[in-house]
Curated annotation (Swiss-Prot):
Keywords: Cell cycle, Cell division, Centromere, Chromosome, Chromosome partition, Kinetochore, Lysosome, Membrane, Mitosis, mRNA transport, Nuclear pore complex, Nucleus, Protein transport, Repeat, Translocation, Transport, WD repeat. This is Nucleoporin SEH1. WD repeats lie at residues 10-49, 55-96, 111-152, 160-210, 217-258, 276-315. Belongs to the WD repeat SEC13 family. GO terms for cellular component: GATOR2 complex; kinetochore; lysosomal membrane; nuclear pore outer ring; Seh1-associated complex. Component of the Nup107-160 subcomplex of the nuclear pore complex (NPC). The Nup107-160 subcomplex includes NUP160, NUP133, NUP107, NUP98, NUP85, NUP43, NUP37, SEH1 and SEC13. Component of the GATOR2 subcomplex, composed of MIOS, SEC13, SEH1L, WDR24 and WDR59. The GATOR2 complex interacts with CASTOR1 and CASTOR2; the interaction is negatively regulated by arginine. The GATOR2 complex interacts with SESN1, SESN2 and SESN3; the interaction is negatively regulated by amino acids. The keyword Kinase does not apply. The lineage of its organism: Eukaryota, Metazoa, Chordata, Craniata, Vertebrata. Coiled coil: none annotated. The GATOR2 complex is negatively regulated by the upstream amino acid sensors CASTOR1 and SESN2, which sequester the GATOR2 complex in absence of amino acids. In the presence of abundant amino acids, GATOR2 is released from CASTOR1 and SESN2 and activated. It comes from Danio rerio (Zebrafish). GO terms for molecular function: structural molecule activity. SMART domains: WD40 (SM00320).
Length: 364
């Protein structure tokens, strides 16, 4: 059972992304008004805006939290061709009494020549690493060699994907059997490149990332992509938001010999495909146990998907943009562009039409 709670986000333009921190008690929103807002859940159960500041000179597409092991750190990316890293500084006590916190810019990453469309921190077992992707098809991986000095970031890898990148997702598996892996989605609408999703894997021998797989069946623009938490599986599960919702299974094929080099080859299977949104799907997000997938689309609804014991995926719930449950089909309402699931219990939705500048919260 989900109960809706509306948040007057007070953004002056469209909300593009909503992101929870690791514990699900802080969230960040970003908007075309060029700002980022940070929200904290109080003891009263209400969400309070504790910081709001202009971050970029263009629309802010994405915002994401680092693992709390590295402190209170955010990254954002923008149409202004940059990504930025922000750190919260403990301010004076009177600021805390007013419920405000200070965030300062630690660095600006300026390598991209086009809009930076997504930004993600790598899984914490890899250290403090940050990945960006750009509309010109380049994925960049940065590392902070000293986690105590977030003003210094070195560019470790540049991956040319040859497609207009729109979204990225790290494989969260920390198993030594799985090399670091990143999925990249593209949203160019031309048919020059048939496969709009690529899987790149780190090669220990060459110390570079190489393309391991292209999902050739994904031919429409991809808006979001998300690896499921691994939880000891021998295969990987990848959710994709395109003109519908798709869930893929990537099963690593056994290498011919232990000494064989080159990226892993995968057997790619479609686990599920849903066109229930009857429209473009903008966000997909897993819960922490990878048992529940949430998707949001232009039909103005969030849909929840769950697999039964036979591994058949079915819709287990539909929520409108205002948080009300849907019985049966629903007509279009405000288009939803952002959905995040920090755990099994919470979900956040950002409304993405000019008339929708609120964030909608559904705690379970």
């Amino acid at each position: 059972m989900f109960v809706a709670k509306s948040i007057a986000a007070d953004h002056k333009d469209l909300i593009h992304d909503v992101s929870y921190d690791f514990h699900g008690r802080r969230m960040a929103t970003c908007s075309s008004d060029q700002s980022v807002k940070v929200w904290d859940k109080g003891d009263d159960g209400e969400w309070h805006c504790t910081a709001s500041w202009k971050t970029h000179s263009g629309s802010v597409w994405r915002v994401t939290w680092a693992h709390p092991e590295f402190g209170q750190v955010l990254a954002s990316c923008s149409f202004d061709r940059t990504a930025a890293v922000w750190e919260e500084i403990v301010g004076e006590s009177n600021d805390k009494q007013r419920g405000q916190s200070h965030w300062i810019k630690r660095t600006t990453l300026v390598d991209s020549r086009t809009s930076v469309t997504d930004v993600k921190f790598a899984p914490k077992h890899m250290g403090l690493m940050l990945t960006t992707c750009s509309a010109d098809g380049v994925v960049r991986i940065y590392e902070a060699p000293d986690v105590m000095n977030l003003s210094q970031w070195s560019l470790q890898h540049e991956i040319s994907c040859k497609l207009a990148c729109s979204c990225i997702s790290w494989n969260p598996s920390s198993s030594r059997a799985h090399p670091p892996m990143i999925a990249v989605g593209g949203d160019d609408s031309n048919g020059a490149y048939s496969g709009k999703v690529q899987i790149h894997e780190y090669n220990e021998n060459t110390r570079k990332y190489a393309k391991a797989e292209t999902l050739m069946t994904v031919t429409d623009p991809v808006h979001d992509i998300a690896f499921a938490p691994n939880l000891g599986r021998s295969f990987h599960v990848l959710a994709i938001a395109t003109k519908d919702v798709r869930i893929f299974k990537l099963l690593p094929l056994r290498r011919e010999s232990a000494n064989s080099s080159g990226p892993t080859k995968f057997e790619v299977q479609v686990m599920a495909q849903f066109d229930s949104h009857n429209s473009q799907v903008w966000r997909v997000s897993w819960n922490i146990t990878s048992t529940l997938l949430a998707s949001s689309g232009d039909d103005g609804c969030v849909r929840l998907w769950k697999a039964n014991y036979m591994d058949n995926w079915k819709c287990t719930g539909i929520l409108r943009g205002d948080g009300s449950p849907v019985n049966g089909s629903s007509g279009p309402s405000a288009a939803l562009s952002a959905v995040g699931v920090p755990g099994a219990a919470q979900m956040i939705v950002g409304a993405a039409t000019a008339g929708r500048k609120k964030a909608q919260l559904m705690p379970g």
